[in-house]
């Protein structure tokens, strides 16, 4: 496989499978507040098993993931965390190197979340421009990878709406519409949402489960017992556990 600095890449792996692209989106837990100082020496090295969209470089090329260097950038609300923190991408790289996804390496990754965000702020007409960025970033991957892509979206969203008091029926409907836009932008995408049992928010969890029951290609993972770094965020170990649960739900049997 050859990755080029511009243009497109020859991306058909030796196993003949489509390039596998992960998109991590939502609020601050999609960016992540796992301490890099807790990571292993291997986890702190450049990880060629995961090629992440470099949001700060011209053309947003795909480059090897490295915690503290390119894993957490252009994420509203986490600007002071860029060099010292990470999210779900760390365990994704572990899975690509020696775990359940080792036969799909390299994986491709787009991070496009924003801290403090509510579902209304992800509407295409919202002044935040969050949806426009989602489209721009995923389009940048499409331009660099030839052929049909396999998309998996991990979404962690709902805490800020619960805190803000967004009416649950309204929230559920708006999230359903948002998921529809995601699946239109990313054909065939499978979406896995995080629930928030480890933080609380029982009504939000119930609505997420209902979305997973009602919508095609949408799943959710419960997070009971997952350790936190504070009241609303998973830390180093918690992010590993959540990522492992997300991976288990990301693929149908036989894939």
PLM segments and residue spans:
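Cell-envelope and extracellular/periplasmic
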Residues: 3-255
């Amino acid at each position: 496989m050859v990755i080029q600095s511009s243009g497109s890449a020859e991306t058909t792996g030796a196993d003949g499978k489509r390039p596998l692209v992960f998109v991590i989106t939502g609020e601050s837990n999609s960016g992540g507040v796992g301490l890099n100082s807790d990571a292993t020496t291997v986890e702190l090295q450049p990880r060629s098993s995961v090629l992440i969209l470099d949001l700060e470089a011209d053309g947003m090329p795909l480059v090897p993931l490295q915690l503290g260097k390119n894993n957490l950038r252009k994420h509203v609300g986490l600007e002071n965390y860029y060099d010292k923190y990470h999210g779900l991408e760390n365990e994704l790289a572990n899975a690509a190197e020696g775990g359940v996804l080792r036969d799909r390496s390299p994986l491709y990754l787009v991070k496009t979340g924003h801290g403090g965000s509510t579902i209304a702020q992800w509407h295409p007409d919202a002044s935040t421009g969050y949806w426009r960025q989602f489209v721009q970033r995923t389009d940048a991957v499409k331009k660099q990878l030839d052929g049909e892509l396999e998309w998996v979206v991990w979404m962690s969203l709902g805490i800020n709406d619960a805190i803000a008091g967004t009416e649950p029926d309204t929230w559920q409907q708006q999230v359903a519409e948002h998921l529809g836009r995601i699946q239109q932008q990313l054909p065939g995408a499978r979406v896995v949402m995080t629930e928030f049992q480890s933080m609380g928010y029982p009504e939000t969890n119930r609505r997420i489960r209902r979305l997973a029951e009602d919508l095609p290609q949408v799943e959710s993972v419960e997070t009971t017992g997952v350790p936190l770094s504070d009241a609303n965020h998973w830390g180093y170990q918690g992010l590993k556990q959540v990522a492992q649960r997300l991976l288990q739900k990301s693929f149908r049997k036989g894939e």
